[in-house]
Amino acid sequence: KDALNREGVERVINRLKEMDFDYIVCDSPAGIETGALMALYFADEAIVTTNPEVSSVRDSDRILGILASKSRRAELGLEPIKEHLLLTRYAPGRVDRGEMLSVGDVQEILAIPLLGVIPESPSVLKASNAGEPVILDHESDAGQAYDDAVARLLGEKRDFRFLQEEKKGFLSRLFGG
């Protein structure tokens, strides 16, 4: 992580720009360390990813402060970075029980547009362990939610799904389905 420096990252990004990609995505580690700061500095858009837990939302709020004050765009007085909120590991039942923040709570704290809500799902761990992106699992709620978020990022209008706990029907409750 200490091998990163601003000039080196800028050089790599400029080379990628010359290759005429539609998008250059710089994933950064959680927290506010060198890798994250380098990605933030050069961002034109930022997908701020957080969990509905107080500590994660606080970290995301600090990231938003850095985007607004210490990015290249901020230093040069350019148009601000376009920010998007991606809420992951969301469990409506846990929200109902007061165990985690709601989508509304997180939106109120961070005050940036909601891009997507990814439900807590065993398919995420399964895909990660298989080395495959969960978005390719079209049967999973998480895969579908990531697909929705990407579509919204590209300008498509999609309703938000997986925000309410699925109510089991009578037969499912009776037979444990």
Label every PLM stretch briefly.
Residues 3-7:
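Glycine-rich oxoanion-binding loops at beta->alpha junctions
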Residues 8-11, 16-23, 28-113:
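Conserved catalytic-core segment of NTP-binding enzymes
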Residues 74-177:
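C-terminal lobe/tail of nucleotide-utilizing enzymes
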Residues 1, 48-51, 134-137:
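Conserved short-loop catalytic and cofactor-binding motifs
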